[in-house]
Amino acid sequence: MSYNFIKSNKENDFYPVNQSEIEEVEKNLNLKLPSELVNFYLEVGYGFIKGSEFNTNRILDPYSVRDFRLRINDFEFYPDIEIYDEFENDKLIFFEGSESALMSIELNDNNKNPIYYYDIQIATSLTEFLRKIEENDQYYLDLLDDE
């Protein structure tokens, strides 16, 4: 999978991730990270997608994904973190749209991993999600209105 559409935007800001970091986090969590997320980490890394003024649009690094899941370090006292308890059973928080908008990626063995905002599917794959975020980094809010 090529993420050139993300890499080619010079306003995006990414940092490399190596295989050993991914393996360490998988061991710490006792689970396999979704294949699309692993591929993205290895091809692009983690970091920020340029968007609107008030959104962070941060793809969490593997250690932050782990820390959120375990509620440790920076996430130990994260505001209202307990809200996500019920939405994480088969998903993993990986993206921070804003402080109050966190997205999760489905844990499955498929080549495509659906993306969720709370329990609402907002994209069928990581690639679709990233393309939509680049176009409109608040598109998922409109989907909430439809529910």
Swiss-Prot record:
Disruption phenotype: Deletion of the yxiB-yxiC-yxiD-yxxD-yxxE operon has no visible growth phenotype, however it is out-competed by wild-type cells. Pfam families: SUKH_6. Gene3D superfamilies: SMI1/KNR4-like (3.40.1580.10). One of its GO terms (cellular component) is cytoplasm. Keywords: Cytoplasm. Transmembrane segments: none annotated. InterPro entries: Knr4/Smi1-like_dom, Knr4/Smi1-like_sf. It comes from Bacillus subtilis (strain 168). Disulfide bonds: none annotated. The gene is yxxD. The lineage of its organism: Bacteria, Bacillati, Bacillota, Bacilli, Bacillales. This is Immunity protein YxxD. Induction: Expressed on rich and minimal solid media likely in early stationary phase; dependent on DegSU. Not expressed in liquid LB, but only under conditions that promote biofilm formation.
